[in-house]
């Protein structure tokens, strides 16, 4: 969490990371050697970058690297935000490949400018019999929700410009290994091992997208002499996820167990003026998948239980002492292409905290009912698209509306004109309501190559 370099913040010493580094890099080395030996046994890896002969023809088969990427520029009434990614992909044979890439962000708000250049997805993928492996800097997706998910907890996120973020593009790459065992045509077993923890990143407290709890904490430190003991937001602290999947013609089901850390800091005022930050355990049991109700109706679902989660108390702009409670999440959703080029996607969600003592930064009531809706009408062979997106919390009254017009000039260039409307409902400091003054028109340029 970004507060200020001048505030009285004490950081706890990091744990002994040398041992974990040695274990992690040794595991990666052994994985690469194992996959390399498997591939060499099959085809010798003689064709990396060379020409070969396709089966049944005299035409040479050339394996060239593939370069792709995108650049996205968003502009509104008070800020602009550039995001870009370049990816280099090289096929190595027998389904093995190497992917490397880089990303950049450039955020401008009033007179504040912030550059950030960092590695993108960088990983090595290989197959060995009924197994496949993926190791490096990963961006993974779990769950069945399109706009929101109670299961998708592998990656932290970049919250650079608040609610205007794109759900899929703002995931933070994390070092890790993924392994999958294809047991038979119906079942597979997979898992992630993540040796290094990194927390989500937030905007500066001076940003229009700064969260209310962070501004309240800064006020305590600047004007009331408070002390904040911040937890390490990056450290060698192993996390893991295991999954058993089953697939049948009309039913998909995935069972998950996640032993992760909270991606957002838990802030607790344990003594008057003494604030402690932490990233405690987030242990989740979940199931997700889909059911073919009819030939034309597919229902997606998620059910998740997070045991004894830690919650930050935040009521009327004041930070209190943390508390503990289970968390239940339910999601049902479907999408469908209708006649006349009309598309609709709808999700319903329930979030339940049975032992909610008071309001938190992200949950205001013991049980909250939410829904997301996306409708899109295509014209002129999808060159012109009118899209409406909405997220509504029926319990608190908060909502986000983002109508858009998309002008697709080519496969490489798209212009977007839209508006973002944030409704505060009954609670002005709710997760959406605190940004109700940030309603703005939006112009966006998307370039893909």
Regions found by a protein language model. Name each.
Residues 86-90, 121-126, 177-181, 242-246, ...:
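Residues on the lipid-exposed face of transmembrane beta-strands in outer-membrane beta-barrel proteins
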Residues 248-253, 258-260, 290-391:
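Detector for outer-membrane/organellar transmembrane beta-barrel domains
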Residues 96-210, 246-249, 422-426:
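Outer membrane beta-barrel
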Residues 67-75, 100-104, 135-139, 191-195, ...:
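Transmembrane beta-barrel strands of outer-membrane/channel proteins
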Residues 65-67, 94-100, 130-133, 186-189, ...:
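Repeated loop/turn-to-beta-strand initiation elements of outer-membrane beta-barrel proteins
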Residues 91-94, 127-130, 183-185, 247-250, ...:
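Outer-membrane beta-barrel strand-turn architecture
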Residues 78-84, 115-120, 171-175, 236-240, ...:
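Residues that define the transmembrane beta-barrel architecture of outer-membrane proteins
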Residues 159, 436-449:
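Outer-membrane beta-barrel "beta-signal"
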């Amino acid at each position: 969490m970004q507060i200020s370099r001048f505030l009285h913040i004490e950081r706890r010493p990091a744990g002994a990371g040398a041992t974990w580094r040695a274990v992690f890099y040794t595991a990666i080395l052994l994985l690469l050697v194992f996959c390399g030996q498997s591939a060499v046994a099959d085809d010798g890896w003689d064709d990396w970058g060379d020409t070969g002969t396709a089966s049944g023809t005299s035409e040479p088969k050339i394996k060239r690297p593939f370069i792709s990427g995108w650049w996205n520029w968003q502009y509104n009434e008070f800020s602009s935000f550039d995001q870009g990614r370049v990816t280099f992909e090289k096929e190595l044979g027998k389904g093995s490949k190497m992917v490397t890439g880089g990303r950049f962000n450039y955020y401008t708000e009033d007179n504040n400018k912030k550059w950030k250049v960092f590695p993108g997805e960088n990983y090595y993928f290989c197959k060995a019999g009924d197994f496949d492996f993926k190791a490096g800097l990963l961006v993974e997706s779990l769950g069945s929700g399109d706009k929101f998910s109670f299961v998708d907890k592998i990656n932290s996120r970049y919250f650079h410009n608040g609610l205007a973020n794109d759900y899929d593009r703002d995931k933070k790459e994390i070092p890790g290994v993924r392994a999958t065992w294809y047991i038979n045509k119906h079942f597979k077993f997979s898992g992630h091992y993540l040796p290094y923890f990194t927390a989500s990143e937030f905007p500066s407290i001076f940003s229009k997208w700064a969260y209310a709890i962070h501004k309240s904490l800064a006020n305590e430190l600047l004007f009331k002499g408070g002390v904040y003991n911040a937890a390490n937001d990056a450290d060698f602290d192993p996390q893991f996820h295991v999954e058993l999947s089953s697939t049948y013609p009309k039913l998909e089901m995935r069972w998950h167990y996640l032993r992760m850390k909270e991606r957002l800091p838990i802030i607790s005022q344990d003594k008057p003026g003494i604030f402690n930050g932490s990233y405690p355990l987030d242990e989740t049991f979940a199931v997700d998948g889909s059911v073919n109700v009819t030939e034309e109706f597919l229902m997606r679902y998620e059910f998740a239980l997070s045991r004894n989660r830690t919650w930050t108390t935040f009521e009327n702009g004041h930070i209190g002492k943390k508390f503990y409670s289970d968390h239940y999440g339910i999601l049902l959703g479907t999408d469908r292409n209708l006649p006349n080029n009309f598309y609709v996607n709808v999700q319903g969600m329930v979030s339940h905290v049975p032992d909610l003592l008071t309001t938190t930064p992200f949950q205001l009531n013991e049980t909250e009912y939410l829904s997301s809706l996306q409708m899109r009408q295509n014209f002129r062979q999808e060159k012109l698209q009118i899209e409406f997106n909405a997220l509504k919390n029926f319990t608190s009254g908060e909502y986000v509306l983002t109508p858009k017009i998309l002008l697709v000039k080519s496969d490489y260039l798209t212009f977007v004109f839209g508006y973002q409307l944030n409704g505060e409902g009954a609670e002005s400091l709710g997760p959406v309501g605190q940004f109700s003054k940030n309603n703005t028109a939006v112009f966006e340029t998307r370039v893909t190559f």
